[in-house]
């Protein structure tokens, strides 16, 4: 049985991970949970999974959670009360929890960086759903992985697809250890993108896009932030940077293709012109399950893919005029150093302000480009962890400053 720590248990990745654990109780045991403010949900999770440690983001909520846990214990609904913690200390403790074999990092944004490093330093294997960790701190995370021997298993659908395609090839060991894919015989990877909420919109109509429009994904069920990232195609741009670090590829070896049906999750092209692809229904539980069960595969009762029912699979190149965030990500990745951290932080803050209706959808790439341009003169090609965290804070403050100075022309 594999013991699992779930960081971000009440979010999209976390809840799906726990659903899988419930479906396979003889395979997975949840030993640690971290959550935000959803006490009702985390209380149910504690009752169902009976973890050894639970951490909340907000320390002020601990007394109420303690009361609820005491009630569960008195009613014999849990056998043993978990250790309760809060804040950064609790998050890092859960990430490095002694009995955990695998840590699922489902925390959104750069907040997942420090607990990810804590898990790596403790020698834990990682199911990485928090792409921002590698994007912002790849220069720190990859050396830490190599030093500790921790294995990094990608939990998002596209990188999981690449990872699965590489199994059974000469590059399998390199992929799962994040030591890079050797060049001989290996040509490129192709990351597929659904096109997001606005794939059928004309570029000139995006000026009218609302928050409700941007958070309505045609294929996937995800959180609001990542759904907006899908609409701007920044999500795919960030995945390009993530793939660079995961598989040791140059940016010229990573291509983005629009595939509206989201059935082919990504492809690997070899030097002999062969293409390996991984197919499946657009369901995040599939790549999460593969991370949890790897190197084995578990039989599921889930719907089977029947290509005859789908009929057509279509593909097209992304429109760079419609999706400027994609090119911003390529540019930041090629610049290297602290630029991806600036891109990521600026995007996180810009999306947050858009969701608050502080400015328009079309302003997201404008803000990000302005902040990245401002950072060029201070680019650090070999940053430390503290320098990455500092530049992350700087970029967020710059987005706020930019929005305040331009608020009148940016508002809905």
From Swiss-Prot:
Instruction: Give the required cofactors.
Output: Mg(2+); Mn(2+)
Q: Which UniProt keywords apply?
A: Isoprene biosynthesis, Manganese, Metal-binding, NADP, Oxidoreductase
The main enzyme category here is: oxidoreductase
InterPro entries, A to Z:
DXP_reductoisomerase (IPR003821), DXP_reductoisomerase_C (IPR013644), DXP_reductoisomerase_N (IPR013512), DXPR_C (IPR026877), DXPR_C_sf (IPR036169), NAD(P)-bd_dom_sf (IPR036291)
Task: Please tell me where NADPH binds in this chain.
Answer: 10-13, 36-38, 130, 132, 223
One example GO MF annotation: NADPH binding
Q: Which SUPFAM superfamilies match?
A: 1-deoxy-D-xylulose-5-phosphate reductoisomerase, C-terminal domain, Glyceraldehyde-3-phosphate dehydrogenase-like, C-terminal domain, NAD(P)-binding Rossmann-fold domains
Q: Which residues bind Mn(2+)?
A: 156, 158, 239
Query: Which reactions is this enzyme annotated as catalysing?
Result: 2-C-methyl-D-erythritol 4-phosphate + NADP(+) = 1-deoxy-D-xylulose 5-phosphate + NADPH + H(+)
Binding residues for 1-deoxy-D-xylulose 5-phosphate: 131, 157-158, 194, 217, 230, 235-236, 239
> What EC number(s) are associated with this protein in UniProt?
1.1.1.267
Pathway involvement of the protein, from the record = Isoprenoid biosynthesis; isopentenyl diphosphate biosynthesis via DXP pathway; isopentenyl diphosphate from 1-deoxy-D-xylulose 5-phosphate: step 1/6
Q: Any one Gene Ontology biological process term?
A: isopentenyl diphosphate biosynthetic process, methylerythritol 4-phosphate pathway involved in terpenoid biosynthetic process
Q: Which family does it belong to?
A: Belongs to the DXR family.
Task: Extract the PANTHER family matched here.
Answer: 1-DEOXY-D-XYLULOSE 5-PHOSPHATE REDUCTOISOMERASE, 1-DEOXY-D-XYLULOSE 5-PHOSPHATE REDUCTOISOMERASE, CHLOROPLASTIC
Give the protein's function: Catalyzes the NADPH-dependent rearrangement and reduction of 1-deoxy-D-xylulose-5-phosphate (DXP) to 2-C-methyl-D-erythritol 4-phosphate (MEP).
Under which name does UniProt file this protein?
Answer: 1-deoxy-D-xylulose 5-phosphate reductoisomerase
Q: Which organism is it from?
A: Prochlorococcus marinus (strain NATL1A)
What lineage does the source organism belong to?
Bacteria, Bacillati, Cyanobacteriota, Cyanophyceae, Synechococcales
